Curated annotation (Swiss-Prot):
Protein name as catalogued: Dihydroneopterin monophosphate aldolase
Amino acids binding Zn(2+): 15, 26, 28
Organism domain of life: Archaea
Pfam families reported in the protein's UniProt record: PTPS
Top EC class, one word: lyase
Reactions catalysed, as given in the entry: 7,8-dihydroneopterin 3'-phosphate = glycolaldehyde phosphate + 6-hydroxymethyl-7,8-dihydropterin
Naturally occurring in which organism (per UniProt): Pyrococcus furiosus (strain ATCC 43587 / DSM 3638 / JCM 8422 / Vc1)
Amino acid sequence: MKARIIYRASFDAAHAVKIEEWEELHGHTFSLEVVVEGEIKKGYVMDFLKLKKVVDGVVKELDHRNLNKIMDNPTTENIALWISERIRKNLPGDVKLKRLSLWEGNEFGVELEW
């Protein structure tokens, strides 16, 4: 039987994005929710603490940073894709990233699904 487990994290970072023109550099508290799926083996999908370590390791790269120095045009969508690529590389082979939600403050967010 498959199950999904969920981990939430947050980080503070600054960015400037280009929609039609470049915005001014500004900051947000980003909220992240990661959902992974796998078979229940020995009573669990993946040790919660291992999932926390994977996600927190990625979040640490972004926390209190200027995201424009890490990626081009750090829109919330691009930040979510960047995070997802790094999480996927560090999950056990039998556990898959199914959903990632990233909120920019309390009003706007993006959700990726696989």
